[in-house]
């Protein structure tokens, strides 16, 4: 990417995309984190390998004195006074005009890059506790895209069996509820709630990034980037605005025998020419990431939290005999709420994003068939033994109307039914 083998390899391995996320997640932890890391490395090379500061010294300064003064001014900050203004004689007034951020730009950029990567790292560390191996399932689904029809069918059946095993153990692992969410390992709602929290972390991180920019650069408004761009467009340069000044002043003292001599020198900060362009780009990029992340977070919450959204999505994946009749709507609701649940719908969306709609439809249709077969088996068991049904969710009063005898047509789809 950068043309430098070591840096290219390090960035690629560090900010490698994952399979269990969406494009907006990757916008933060891959694209933005890589950009910030690249800017950090670029500024570091200019600052510590090249010449970060050059000062105009008095005539009596020779060799080592000049190097000492430049190193001192770079470390101890410089201050900016507009050319048309008089240099204040009071030390406190000079300290108020100090610019102390340019030395820390590489470090702050590196910290910001890590902050964009942090939610992804937390997500990767915690999702395994929810009982579902997302990477394996999604990777297997991705591999099916390039297979022929017969091989893909066998692969789909294996995947469906694997997911079905998790579906069969969901009731044993659930141990709590919160509104429409169920807690526990397996396919309940634990993973979905965790993913929503991660989405909120991505969103909160962008807000924090704007606060960091303001505090670090000493701005009083969150519209700094817009104002700076407006100044540049209007021809108002740094000499007047004081934003990333190239020419600054520096005070330092030199002890000669028993006397201390105070000097004020004028310095050139070429690094600020890069910093201005970098931070102006970063500000507008953060605005784009903020808007995109905000919209995506709202959409994710809606898609995972509202029954209507989950039902509509599942209906779009089923190309079989699913019409808008009441019974068939109830069947889809049973499959989405008691079969897949929120975590299963989230898995279907990840597979859809990475493996494509065709593979996702085949997997979802097979899972739907298995769900219908399980309902038929439970219905037969219920009528044959006159006992309470063990169908998922029935003991909680959900979808009891699905299991009445007058709705036999719902339990008799056009695919073969397996009886226990």
Swiss-Prot record:
Tissue/organ expression: Evenly distributed along the adjoining membranes of the two pm5 pharyngeal muscle cells.
- The chain's disulfide connectivity reads none
Q: Which UniProt keywords apply?
A: Cell junction, Cell membrane, Gap junction, Ion channel, Ion transport, Membrane, Transmembrane, Transmembrane helix, Transport
**How does the protein's chain sit in the membrane according to the entry?**
Multi-pass membrane protein
Q: Could you tell me which residues belong to the region Disordered?
A: 378-405
Q: InterPro entries this protein is in?
A: Innexin
- Which coarse location class applies to the principal site listed for this UniProt protein? membrane
Per the record, where are the segments of Basic and acidic residues compositional bias? 395-405
- Provide a GO CC annotation, any one: plasma membrane
Q: What happens when the gene is disrupted?
A: RNAi-mediated knockdown impairs gap junction function in pharyngeal muscles which disrupts the synchronized muscle contraction between the pharyngeal metacorpus and terminal bulbs and thereby decreases the pharyngeal pumping rate.
**Transmembrane regions listed in the UniProt entry:** 33-53, 104-124, 193-213, 278-298
Q: What does this protein do?
A: Structural component of gap junctions. Plays a role in maintaining gap junction activity to promote phayngeal muscle contraction.
Q: What does the record note on quaternary structure?
A: Interacts with F-actin.
Supply the name of the protein. Innexin-3
* Provenance organism: Caenorhabditis elegans
Primary gene name: inx-3
């Amino acid at each position: 990417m950068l043309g430098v083998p070591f840096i290219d390899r390090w960035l690629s391995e560090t900010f490698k995309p994952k399979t269990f996320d969406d494009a907006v997640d990757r916008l933060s932890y891959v694209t933005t984190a890589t950009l910030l890391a690249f800017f950090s490395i670029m500024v570091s090379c200019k600052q510590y390998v090249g010449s970060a500061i050059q000062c105009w010294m008095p005539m009596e300064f020779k060799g080592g004195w000049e190097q000492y003064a430049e190193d001192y001014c770079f470390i101890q900050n410089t201050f900016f006074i507009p050319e048309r203004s008089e240099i204040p004689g009071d030390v406190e007034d000079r300290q108020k005009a100090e610019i102390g951020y340019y030395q820390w730009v590489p470090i702050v950029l590196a910290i910001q890059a890590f902050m964009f990567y942090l939610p992804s790292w937390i997500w990767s560390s915690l999702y395994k506790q929810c009982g579902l191996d997302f990477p394996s399932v999604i990777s297997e689904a991705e591999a099916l895209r390039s297979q022929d029809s017969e091989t893909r069918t066998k692969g789909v059946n294996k995947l469906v069996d694997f997911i079905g095993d998790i579906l069969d153990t969901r009731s044993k692992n659930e141990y709590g509820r919160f509104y429409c969410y169920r807690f526990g390992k397996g396919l309940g709602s634990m993973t979905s709630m965790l993913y929503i929290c991660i989405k909120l972390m991505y969103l909160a991180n962008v807000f924090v990034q704007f606060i960091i920019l303001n505090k670090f650069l000493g701005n009083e408004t969150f519209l700094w980037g817009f104002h700076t761009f407006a100044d540049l467009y209007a021809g108002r340069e740094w000499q007047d605005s004081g934003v990333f000044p190239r020419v600054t002043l520096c005070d330092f003292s030199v002890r000669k025998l028993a006397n201390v001599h105070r000097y004020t020198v004028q310095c050139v900060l070429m690094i600020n020419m890069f910093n201005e362009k970098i931070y102006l780009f970063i500000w507008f990029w953060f605005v784009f990431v903020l808007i995109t992340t905000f919209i995506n977070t709202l959409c994710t919450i809606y898609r995972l939290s509202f029954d209507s959204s989950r039902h509509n999505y599942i209906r779009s994946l089923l190309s079989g005999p699913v019409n808008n009749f009441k019974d068939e709507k109830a069947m889809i609701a049973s499959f989405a709420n008691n079969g897949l649940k929120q975590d299963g719908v989230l898995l279907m969306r990840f597979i859809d994003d990475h493996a494509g709609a065709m593979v996702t439809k085949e997997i979802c249709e097979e899972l739907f068939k298995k769900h219908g077969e399980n309902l038929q088996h439970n219905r037969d068991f219920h009528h044959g033994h006159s006992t309470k049904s063990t169908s998922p969710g029935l003991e909680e009063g959900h979808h009891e109307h699905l299991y009445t005898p007058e709705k036999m047509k719902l339990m008799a789809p056009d695919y073969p039914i397996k009886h226990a």
